[in-house]
Amino acid sequence: MAISPVLFIGLIYLAGGGSLFPGVEAIWLTVPESGERCVYEEIQANVVVVLDYICIDDAFTQLGPTLDVRVTSPYGKELYKIANVTHGQAAFTTSESGTFLACLAMHHDQSHHSVNSSVIVSLDWKMGIRAKDWDSVAKKEKIEGVELEIRRSTEYASAIRANILYLRIREAYMREINEKTNTRVNQLGLMSLGVAIVVSISQVLYLKRYFLKKKLI
C-alpha cells in the first residue's frame, strides 16, 4: 500500500514534535558583536510554543556576554522582548499561521560591555506536544505509567490528524494558486499571440500598399 506524500510528511512532522527535522533538538548559532541573528519557524495557528535559549561564554570571562531577544509574529507583532539576559524562556500561543521570527543580538550599554567578539547561543523551539510539560500533567491529574502513555499517544494521534488536515489545506491552496497562475499565463500567451498576428497583418498590408504605390508589384 502506497503512502501519500501528505501523510508521509505529516508523520515526519509529528515524529519531530512539530518540526520537519526530528533529529534536531536545538539550534546552535553564533551571534556577532554587532547586528543580530534571526531564526524563523513556520508554525500553525493555535499552537503552544516554548522557546528556550542560553548563551555560552566560551572564554569563561567574568564579563560574559548577554543577549537582547525578541520574538515577532508573521505580521510583525512583538510576542516577546527582553534585554541583557544570558538565558530564558519565551512561551506563547500562536493566533495565526505563518513565519515566526526569533532575533538575538549581543547586549551593549554603559553598565555592561562584553569582551567577547561573538557569542554562541543554543536555541530550542518546542511546539505542540513537545511544549507540553507531561510531568506536571501526570502530577495534576494523578496519572502515571500506562495511563500516561495512553494519554500521550492519544494526543499524538490528534496531532497527526490536525497536521495532515493542515497540510492538505496548504496543498489545496497551493494547487489553486498554481492553477490560477497557469490560467493567467495561458491568457497572456493568447493575448501575445493575438497582438503578434495583428501586428504582422498590419505590416503586410502596409508593405502591400507601399509596393503598390511605388508600382513595384
From Swiss-Prot:
Please indicate the residue ranges that the annotation assigns to the motif COPII vesicle coat-binding. Answer: 210-211
One Pfam entry name: EMP24_GP25L
Q: Cite the ranges annotated as topological domain Lumenal.
A: 27-186
Xref: PROSITE patterns: GOLD
Mention one GO biological process in which this protein takes part, according to its record. protein transport
Question: In the record, which residues are listed under signal peptide?
Answer: 1-26
Q: Which keywords label this protein?
A: Coiled coil, Endoplasmic reticulum, ER-Golgi transport, Glycoprotein, Membrane, Methylation, Protein transport, Signal, Transmembrane, Transmembrane helix, Transport
Sequence motif COPI vesicle coat-binding, location on chain: 210-217
Q: How does it sit in the membrane?
A: Single-pass type I membrane protein
Q: List membrane-spanning regions.
A: 187-207
A single Gene Ontology CC annotation of this entry is:
endoplasmic reticulum membrane
Compartment(s): Endoplasmic reticulum membrane
Family of the protein in this entry: Belongs to the EMP24/GP25L family.
Quaternary structure, from the entry: Probably oligomerizes with other members of the EMP24/GP25L family. Associates with the COPI vesicle coat (coatomer). Associates with the COPII vesicle coat (coatomer).
About its domains, the entry says:
The cytoplasmic C-terminal domain contains a functional dilysine-retrieval motif, which is involved in the retrograde Golgi-to-ER transport of the protein.
Protein's recorded name: Transmembrane emp24 domain-containing protein p24delta6
